[in-house]
Design a protein with these regions (language model features):
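Carbohydrate-recognition beta-sandwich/jelly-roll modules
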Residues: 1-61
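Aromatic- and carboxylate-enriched substrate-binding clefts and catalytic-loop regions
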Residues: 61-253
């Protein structure tokens, strides 16, 4: 800053964040959540994507940046991230549709296990040896090395197979895990050892997804939502940090 005046310090800080942040532009897209929530199916997703595009294009509106499938695709009884029977062909048909519409595809994933019964999901995952249960938060231990490896493999595979341009990572750490038998450190003031390890792991996940997309000459938008500290330093690794402001939705009253 050129002086210690608040306005100069603030400008210098904003310039610094702008310099380190991932390139970000205005983005317009559709997300399935407020239409269907978890009642999505391959059929109603395809119909809604098509109808929205038809309504926009018939009125001279350019294609959206992406169409996003939110929660509702996961088989939570399986013990790991996989597609339920409502999506018999996974997301192949839907991603082909978005390509035909001249736009891109996005997908939701809840690192801590979603918002239904993440405790049951996490326990099944632990039983299968694919992750660990966080007894403090009653969900998936998001710093467990086994889970990080397996979820990274799933994310990268999905990114490649479904040409994912936008990831909505929804729900990270509700409460730090204190289990010393897990493959992460514990202790420190405010559980700082777990928290630091967890975020270092996820930063590497974000980097790997970007590297994969960049390798193929493609872009990527990463949106962190829920149970995330709203720090501007995250913008080095993600494009947006979600803060809830949904008073305009019909069922919020």
């Amino acid at each position: 800053a050129k002086s210690d005046l608040l306005v100069d310090v603030q400008k210098a800080f904003y310039d610094y964040i702008e310099n380190i942040a991932a390139p970000t532009t205005l983005r317009l897209q559709y997300n399935s959540w407020y239409d269907f929530m978890k009642d999505i199916t391959a059929d109603n997703i395809e119909k809604s994507f098509y109808e929205i595009e038809k309504g926009l294009s018939s009125n001279g509106v350019a294609p959206l940046d992406a169409y996003v499938v939110d929660d509702g695709w996961v088989d939570y009884k399986s013990g790991f991230w996989s597609f339920n029977k409502k999506f018999p062909n996974q997301l192949y048909d839907i991603t082909q549709l978005t390509a035909n519409l001249g736009t891109k595809f996005g997908l939701w994933l809840g690192p801590r296990g979603g918002y239904g019964r993440p405790d049951l999901f996490a326990k099944k995952m632990e039983k299968r040896g694919l992750g660990a249960y966080n007894a403090e938060a009653k969900d998936i231990c998001v710093a467990d090395k086994t889970y990080i490896k397996n979820v990274t493999d799933f994310i990268l595979k999905s990114t490649q197979e479904f040409n994912i341009d936008y990831w909505k990572f929804d729900g990270f750490c509700l409460s730090p895990c204190k289990n010393p038998n897990h493959s992460h450190p514990v202790g420190g003031e405010y559980d700082m050892y777990f928290v630091s390890e967890m975020w270092h792991c996820w930063i590497e996940v974000f980097k790997k997804i970007r590297e994969l997309r960049k390798k193929h000459g493609k872009g990527l938008w990463i949106n962190m939502t829920c149970y995330v500290n709203p720090s501007p330093w995250w913008l080095q690794y993600v494009n947006s940090i979600w803060l809830q402001n949904s008073a305009d939705i019909g069922f919020a009253d």
